[in-house]
Amino acid sequence: MKLLRQLLALCAFLSVAASTPSSLAAETPKDIVLTGDAICTSCHDEADSPELLAIGKTRHGTRADKRTPSCTSCHGQSKDHINYKGPAKPPKPDVTFGAKTKVAAEARNDACQECHKKDAKRSHWEGSIHQTRDVACTSCHKIHVAKDPVIDKRTQSETCFNCHKEQRSQGSKPSHHPLAEGKMACSDCHNAHGSVGPSLMTRNSVVETCYTCHMEKRGPFVRSHQPVQEDCAICHNAHGTTTESMLKTRPPFLCNSCHGPHMPIQPALSSGPKAASAVTGWWDASVITQGKSCVSCHSQIHGSNNPSGLNPNPQRLFR
């Protein structure tokens, strides 16, 4: 009887052992973490390609996450590359992402969007200016590095400036947003993956984007200044200018681009010729010698509860 029990136990053990591989195969995903990667790292090791293995320090190389892709998830099956046994360099993988790649941007982006397509920030990629100009994800993003420079505020702008050279120049002017200081990033105003706003703005309009930080300019005011409601870029260049407050040009020249000349508020100040000054926009050339400009009186440019955006205490102007 004892011998019979031992034989039955042995048969049961062998039966389970025989069925285990097939059952595991049925439960195991086709492309689990590091499946097939061992083949890649047999050549692309620390001695041959140390920079490639830095991906292990990123989300793309987190073994504990079942969503983590394998090499072939991005580079394709690449059978010719993997199975090559010749003395020369093997053929390239099916999908490559380097600066010299001949793979179309659309094919490279498709590899990324296999995972990154359910994010609201990327919902407007199709038809965006970057997509229609064949910008690839890897034109901006670096995958095989411990930290992607475009995600870090301190280094993001340098990535953008590789293409947007005019904005780099403007950002070096005296009046600018603090990108160079690392306090802001291009993505604070722009969504590089596409948006419904102009110039890839994060909001639906320029003013709505600006108001996310400059709420005090929004109002409501009894008397609003129309450009503030329409487009901040009418007066400002957000990337940088040589004029205070990032104005495109200084008052009164900026004001005169929309507003015509008018009489001084105190005729007693008038002592010059009665022709409108081309410099000040006033019917009084003496204002120039007083160091006045439009904003000396109309100080509440963005909106005011006073007529014409006048200073709440105009008597201070003439002390």
Q: Whereabouts are the PLM-identified features?
A:
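Short sequence/structural segments immediately N-terminal
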Residues: 3, 22-319
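Bacterial N-terminal signal peptides
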Residues: 8-19
